[in-house]
Curated annotation (Swiss-Prot):
It comes from the Bacteria. Residues 1-104 form the SSB domain. A motif (Important for interaction with partner proteins) lies at residues 162-167. Keywords: DNA damage, DNA recombination, DNA repair, DNA replication, DNA-binding. Residues 109-118, 132-147 have a biased composition (Low complexity). GO terms for molecular function: single-stranded DNA binding. Plays an important role in DNA replication, recombination and repair. Binds to ssDNA and to an array of partner proteins to recruit them to their sites of action during DNA metabolism. This is Single-stranded DNA-binding protein 1. PANTHER family: SINGLE-STRANDED DNA-BINDING PROTEIN. Transmembrane segments: none annotated. The lineage of its organism: Bacteria, Bacillati, Bacillota, Bacilli, Bacillales. Homotetramer. GO terms for biological process: DNA recombination; DNA repair; DNA replication. The keyword DNA damage applies.
Length: 167
């Protein structure tokens, strides 16, 4: 059987953190995940998915995620039940996370969720937008590989049998 869940969403509130009597760290949080389609009014609805994570990942979630943080989770769906204070049976379905990925810088939430304009400007520099005075050895050496292409001077169709193709 297959039980796998992969979600990307934003935390609806700060994670709740506790330690079990046996010393295991536990963090619970709710992810708001947008649906891929719109409703009759043209708005996207969201699902609110309960998640739980244990041990070191729980410590990291507690230390680095907060309300509004963008996170990706990978885990499995699990159902459990318990009896509440009124004596009623309560059923809970949640994602038990094997992995939680932090999908934005920690300081992104300090600006109300808005990125500063220059926050990511340096990321494009390695892809041809070299600034003056910057020594980028990747750009200098990447163009020398063109002569290694065995088909660079081919003038017609390539003669290859179907038996030589890997598919």
């Amino acid at each position: 059987m297959l039980n796998r869940v992969v979600l990307v969403g934003r935390l609806t509130k700060d994670p709740e953190y506790r330690t079990t009597p046996s010393g295991v760290s536990v963090a619970t949080f709710t992810l708001a995940v947008n649906r891929t389609f719109t409703n009759a009014q043209g708005e996207r609805e969201a699902d609110f998915i309960n998640c739980v994570v244990f041990r070191r990942q729980a410590d990291n979630v507690n230390n680095y995620l907060s309300k509004g943080s963008l996170a990706g989770v990978d885990g499995r769906l699990q159902s459990r039940n318990y009896e509440n204070q009124e004596g009623r049976r309560v059923f809970v379905t949640e994602v038990v996370c094997d992995s939680v990925q932090f999908l934005e810088p920690k300081n992104a939430q300090q600006n109300g969720g808005q990125r500063q304009q220059n926050e990511f400007q340096d990321y494009g520099q390695g892809f041809g937008g070299q600034q003056s005075g910057q020594n980028n050895s990747y750009n200098n050496s990447s163009n020398t590989k063109q002569s290694d292409n065995p088909f660079a001077n081919a003038n017609g169709p390539i003669d290859i049998s179907d038996d030589d193709l890997p598919f």
